[in-house]
Amino acid sequence: DDGALVSTEDVDPPILITKSDGSYLYLTTDLGTVVHREKSQKYDKYIYVVDSRQKNHFEQVFKTVKHFNLSSSSFIHVGFGTVNGPDKKPFKTRDGNVYKLSKLHEDIKEKLIKYNEDEDILNILTNTVLTFSDLLPNRNQNYEFDLEKFTDINGKTGVYIQYAQVRARKLLESKTEIVNTDIDTNFNLDERRLLLLISKFDYFYFQSFDNYQPHHLADYLYNLCQTFNSFYANNKIFSDDVPDSVKLKRIEIVNNFYTLTNLIFNCLGIQPVDSM
């Protein structure tokens, strides 16, 4: 009645195409984007990674696409929670209370410089902190932005996982050639725990991939690094009193851990550093 254009098709809730002043809505532009992509790209599946609070909006978008046969592709909304400040309230760009990425990057680097002053390594560590901190929580849950917590080398952080893989890398670089010996096949508790956890990679990978929930793989990576650090602390490798057969076994365990962590780093978009 006031000049707005509403579809008369049987779609619930009704589709508002244009407002009374002639302007378009998010739904209108999203539908236009679907039509454009259908003509120019035509993918089998479209995944919208958007705030969970937009759930109803995307349900209506996808329902409209199906109703009008705008595309035969599948459409999925992967929602995520909010990043909150110390006041437990979500950061909002319109309120002007959000970190600029450049400022955030510099603040993290300042906290990490005590671990390594090399600029290239600092940049990688900073990106690791940002990536891992965002992937670790269940994407459906809100989390509090805490710079101190995210950069704690002893916490559940990107710094911690980088330190573990660097430790493994250094062990492999310092190994000596061992020949004419069989590998020891008796495993202590630390060795069994680490190997058992390594064997569970497929499960956590597909939990993340099939459900669009990377926190399964991120949490698994942290537990893997934590278990490796316990193994490292309790088991000597290169000491003279360690038999060659045991050295060989433990080197292979370290190699398996290092290879797997680098694979998971790649899955999560994290670049390993060479040193810390």
Language model features with spans:
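Non-catalytic interaction-recognition regions
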Residues: 1-276
